[in-house]
Amino acid sequence: MWEVSKKENLDRKLIEVCRHFRIPGEYQFCEEIKVGNVNKTYKVTFEGEDPKNPGNMRLKSYIVQSVNTFAFKNPVQVMDNIDKVTEYIHAKDPGRCALHYHHTADRKTYIFDKSGFWRLFNFIPSVTYSATENLQVIRNAGLAFGNFQMLLSDFDASQLHETIPDFHNTIKRYEQMEEQIAIDPVDRVKEVRAEIDWLESVKEQACKLTQLQLDGVLPLRVTHNDTKINNVLFDKDTDEALVVIDLDTVMPGLVGHDFGDAVRFAANFVEEDSLETEKAGVNMEIFRAFAEGFLSKTAKSLTQPELDTLALSCLALTCELATRFLADYIAGDVYFKTNYDEHNLVRARCQIALAKDMLKKMPQMESVIQDCVKKL
């Protein structure tokens, strides 16, 4: 009985949210989409008249999300960034499949009430991949993120809010780790001396991207900042990339942040928390496939310093995440969700192993990028 009541309350709330966004027709049903662990996501379906066939009825679906305001402290700024970026992309390429966030009567892309922070956008029939070794899918993912970057290459990134300050400021991430080392709140530093020493030994290389940005060598651009392959929707029949999703972290950043984090996630031989750290490393076939797709769309709009530091960006983003995992382990596991006592340490060691392999393969990675650019 309680479950029925809970379902009825959810249905009522979703109908209320949809009416705020002026969704026509009669509510039919909803289903929770349990992908991602930050926001609550629902697919809602309405029945209404088909505008292309007057007199005929059709079912149309939408995505409704309840945004996690603990994770996103300034959700209004998040939505302002998303609205600006999605409208700009649509204006530049109106015929392309795109995310469209619906507006309320007072032109807001959200409603904020006692039940939470809600938004609604179009449902796009598609498939996603959490991980794959299919090189065409990887290439298409690179193309999708590259196209996202290309369409926004002339957008003034200063118009966007920095919703997560210093998110990819590797210098600050190192400082945060070093602060935890100095405090050593739960007496774990002695366990991780080897990891600390190695990360400190590559600090200058890892922080070079951030330093070049501070020196004015690398320009700030609109960046996605969560370029995992599962943030691309693919055509279920052809594996063509349709659109980049999950724009909550869109803000000013470096193009290398998006490229490097995508490679870090997709091209590792193992999962980022694998216990088999000896198997961690860069799959060069996947690296090449992603680079081919990404650069086919971006090479002509990137500066030479940006192109020259793309391979380095992979090392920078990997070391950055390693410092975050290690800092959290030293702090007593207060930030990242863990499944067992040494989970953050395992994560840090896996990223360090990946970074070590990146250092060995840096000449190969740089050569691949140069080859991709030459072929255009």
What are the residue ranges of the model-derived segments?
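Active-site acidic catalytic loop and adjacent metal/ATP-binding pocket
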Residues: 37-46, 51-52, 56-59, 63-64, ...
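ATP-dependent phospho-/nucleotidyl transfer catalytic cores
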Residues: 24, 31-35, 73-76, 127-139, ...
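ATP-binding pocket architecture of kinase catalytic cores
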Residues: 49-53, 57-159, 182
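Hydrophobic alpha-helical bundle architecture
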Residues: 122, 293-314
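Active-site activation/catalytic loop segments of kinase-like enzymes and analogous catalytic loops
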Residues: 252, 256-300, 316-335
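Juxta-kinase regulatory segment immediately upstream of eukaryotic protein kinase catalytic domains
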Residues: 1-31
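Short secondary-structure junctions
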Residues: 19-27, 91-97, 300-301
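Long, compositionally biased intrinsically disordered regions
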Residues: 358-362
